[in-house]
Amino acid sequence: MELLDKLAILSDAAKYDAACTSSGVRRGFRPGMIGNTTSSIAGCCHSFSADGRCITLLKVLLSNACVYDCKYCVNRRSNDTRRAAFTPRELAELTIGFYRRNYIEGLFLSSGVLRSPDYTMELMIRALRILREEYRFNGYIHAKAIPGAALELVRQLGLLADRLSVNIELPSQQGLQTLAPDKSREAILRPMGLIRDGTAQSKAELAKYRHAPVFAPAGQSTQLIVGATDDSDRHILHLTESLYRKFRLKRVFYSAYVPVVENSLLPSLDTKPPLLREHRLYQADWLLRFYGFQASELLDEAHPDFDTRLDPKCSWALAHLEQFPVEVMRADLETLLRVPGVGPVSARRIVSARRCGTLRFEDLKKLGVVVKRAQYFLLCDGRAAPGLRFSPATIVQQLEAVERGLLPSGEMQQLSLFDAVG
């Protein structure tokens, strides 16, 4: 099979993996090395780093052949699809060739399970070792560790990659047993623990020894599928909170299930991917990470799923109207962060700006506040927004109208690397 044919198959097979960001790790020029993690050039797969930069990665599988038969996966053993596999050298040469042509600045590498997890990981390590040691590639690499592989292989992979991730796949043990019986929760969580400990140890050693080996400097992430099982948003959010706390994950990625295979245990093929639900989970994830919320505050047994009509912070605020309106001139930073339309940056700007004088609603807009949302929950020097009229009965409809204006119209689709452009 020609190399271009392999690339077409294996890049298309990788499109369902959502955990693809560079995380903002900054490793600049090194003498004798090729590439860096900070440039921004056009390329194969656009992703965004933690500081908002658009970066480009070659996003491929080492192989889409797999000994597992996960019912939701397009690459499962029983699915009749074209199979391909790169050799470690082919993958390394392809990556360095794309980099030298200015197509990419890094690599995102995952794989189906060939023969066994250990065998697959050995091939991935060999490919990355050729890149790092033979071609002196210094660019960004995000590698997916294979659950069930020997921990020593995970350690070796972490010494070659900037970020590691282990996909948790499904939110519950029951879902995993039903749809992916070849996988186990223990096999997924064990390498997560090793990566957590490895990154902590690496940081401690680097503080003492400047040239100590660096282990996964950008940390670890994971991905879970939303909509393949009947797990509630509440269950997913509590799982996310636990993963952040126990394993110090940098990111949890949510992937709306795209029906690609027919199975009685899965949604039918004509079911649309729950993209808006995925979006709400990402918004709630940010509330956990940057706004001081806890999962138990956002959802409870009476309301186990998000109202997709409103963003999670608006939903929380409407359920706690007794805490509003908030006085801009007196509220502390933590209180401001709970106001819809106010983010971490704008909240800090408010705290700083109000020292210089009284703030008005027109000032809030200049500070980055989304006044269309925030005006229902704020007072400026004891006054509501000019001309604002609403009641608890109508505020939901007014916020829904704001939300409809912020969401993209039409159906969103995954783009292929080989789609025609023009």
Range-by-range predicted roles:
Residues 353-354:
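Residue-level signature of tetratricopeptide-repeat
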Residues 67-69, 85, 98-108:
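Short, flexible active-site-proximal loops enriched in glycine and acidic residues
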Residues 57, 70, 109, 166, ...:
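Conserved, mostly hydrophobic/aromatic
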Residues 60-89:
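Canonical Radical SAM [4Fe-4S] cluster-binding loop centered on the CxxxCxxC motif
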Residues 305-335, 361-422:
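C-terminal extensions
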